């Protein structure tokens, strides 16, 4: 809350209703699909790479999930605060400072910072990939709204998954799918199809900011 208030008060993240006024509702549907389609493949990749959350992080995450304010913190406040800081402030400044030919460098730098602040490899790699997608959407729109929607969808899915299946954090994907790797691979393939379709749609629907 303090981060959101500070960045809004100091105008480090300019606030504008210009993007919302365009009523890009169907575009946001594809943003949600992009988030949902990326979650399972990224989890599969980190598991296959042998990366695990540190026990302290798992304990903290479980505590937040079971908290009365857990949904507010994870699904609402965290997406707004992180998008204001990393896309609305840091990436915005880098895009303004870099020549257009180097805009992807600005996105990579911001994504790397986004990964580093998570302070562990499992979340860090996931956050880096997510940061590339969020940065691309911000570069196209110069609005943090798509990023907030993406973040909201990703965190909301995780929140309700662990609420419905409290032991999910202690299981691998194979264990979660009944020790059947074929089922896991089919689920990952289906998720990648959703991800690919969403990325294709957003490439056309997110018009580059001129």
Regions found by a protein language model. Give the residues of each.
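Alpha-helical transmembrane segments in multi-pass membrane proteins
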Residues: 1-11, 29-30, 184-187
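Juxtamembrane helix-loop-helix connectors linking adjacent transmembrane helices
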Residues: 12-84, 91-97, 172-176
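C-terminal membrane module of polytopic membrane proteins
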Residues: 152-210
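Hydrophobic residues within alpha-helical transmembrane segments
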Residues: 77, 109-113, 125, 129, ...
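Membrane-interface helix caps and helix-loop-helix hairpins in membrane proteins
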Residues: 116-122
């Amino acid at each position: 809350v303090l981060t959101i208030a500070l960045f809004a008060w100091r105008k480090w993240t300019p606030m504008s209703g210009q993007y919302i006024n365009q009523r890009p509702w169907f575009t946001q549907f594809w943003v949600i699909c992009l988030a949902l389609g990326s979650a399972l493949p990224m989890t599969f990749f980190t598991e296959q790479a042998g990366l695990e959350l540190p026990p302290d992080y798992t304990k903290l995450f479980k505590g937040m999930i079971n908290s009365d304010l857990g949904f507010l913190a994870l699904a609402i406040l965290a997406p707004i605060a992180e998008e204001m800081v990393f896309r609305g402030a840091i990436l915005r400044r880098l895009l303004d400072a870099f020549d257009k030919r180097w805009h992807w460098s600005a996105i990579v730098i911001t994504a790397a910072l986004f990964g580093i602040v998570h302070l562990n490899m499992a979340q860090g790699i996931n956050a880096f990939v997510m940061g590339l997608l969020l940065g691309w959407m911000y570069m196209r729109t110069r609005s943090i709204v798509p990023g907030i929607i993406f973040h909201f969808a990703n965190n909301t899915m995780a929140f309700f998954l662990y609420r419905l299946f409290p032991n999910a954090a202690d299981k691998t994907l194979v264990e979660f799918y009944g020790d059947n790797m074929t089922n896991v691979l089919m689920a990952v393939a289906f998720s990648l199809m959703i991800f690919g379709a969403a990325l294709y749609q957003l490439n056309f629907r997110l018009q580059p900011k001129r």
